Every structure is written in structure tokens, then in C-alpha cells.
Amino acid sequence: DVYKRQALPNCPQHLLTIFAAHKLGAVVAEHNPLYTARELEGPCKDHAAKVAVVWDKIAPLFQELSRTTPIEKVVSVNMIDAMPLVKRLALKLPIKSLKEKREQLHAEAPGTIPFSELQSPKMGGDGADIQNCPDTNQDSPAFILFTSGTTGKPKGAQLTHGNVMSNVVQGRSWISGI
């Protein structure tokens, strides 16, 4: 299996990368974006993902992890890019509180691949030519979620595509209108 690790807060880019990974047949290994290098090293070695899509504020941490884990490429996500235009413009105003908020949300991430470049024409198109992975079915792994490690080292729990679809069906039956 091909694995892609992800350490992102809730943001539109998070969903986009999940859909893209699954379209390619990759398994998404989710990580808490607030974890330290020590907390991430074991899980990163366990699933051996070569690509990490991460919040740009923590990109240096994953660049450091690339020295001791299989990470080969780090894609950095600027969360401000997906905000509505009014909010993006407001964050550019020279007001102290807005500058502090901007610094909380974004940091330069040299040496990484900016997420925005993945959406550019120079990357080879809009992805319409990518075919679904023929080997993916309801029993194929979709995600690896790691336990907290309260009784030892964190362990990776696999969710299959069937597990995820069952969760969607459950949600739709409990909440009308979705």
C-alpha cells in the first residue's frame, strides 16, 4: 500500500488532500498537528509514508523528521489561502491583533512544496486524467488513525473504505437532511 501522512487542522485543504490520496489509491495516515517530533517519529516509521502534507506552521518539524523517517517530500499548507476573501484581506491590515492572528495561522516553510503549487497548471493539469486506483474496494484501507499511546506506544488502527462508508450511512440515518 502507498501511504501519505497528514498533519492538518480542520481546513478545506485537509479534505482536498484526502480525496486526492484516495483517488490515487493511497492510505491516509492522520496525525495530530500539535504533536512533537518525539511523538510523531514512531508512527511515521510504522506506516513509512514518503509524502507529508502538513500545516506550514509545523513544516520544519516534518523536515526534521525526514532525517530519521521515510519522509521524502513535505507539502506545506497555508490555511489563510482557503479563507474567504474578506478574511484574507483583513489579515493583511497593519493592525497589531490581526498581525498576531496571521502569525498564529501561517509561517514561511522554505524547502517544502507549497500546497498552492499542486493546484497550478505547471503541475500537469487539473487531475481529470487520473484514474481511480483499480485495486481499491470496500476492504481496502483508507485511513490509519493512531491511538494516544496511553498504555504504551501509539498503535495504528486501520479504517477501510467500507468502514468510512458505513459511518456516512449511519450519519445520514441519524441526521435528516445530510
Regions found by a protein language model. Give the residues of each.
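Conserved coil-to-alpha-helix start sites within the AMP-binding
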Residues: 8-19, 34-38
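Short hydrophobic alpha-helical segments of the AMP-binding
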Residues: 17-22, 28, 164
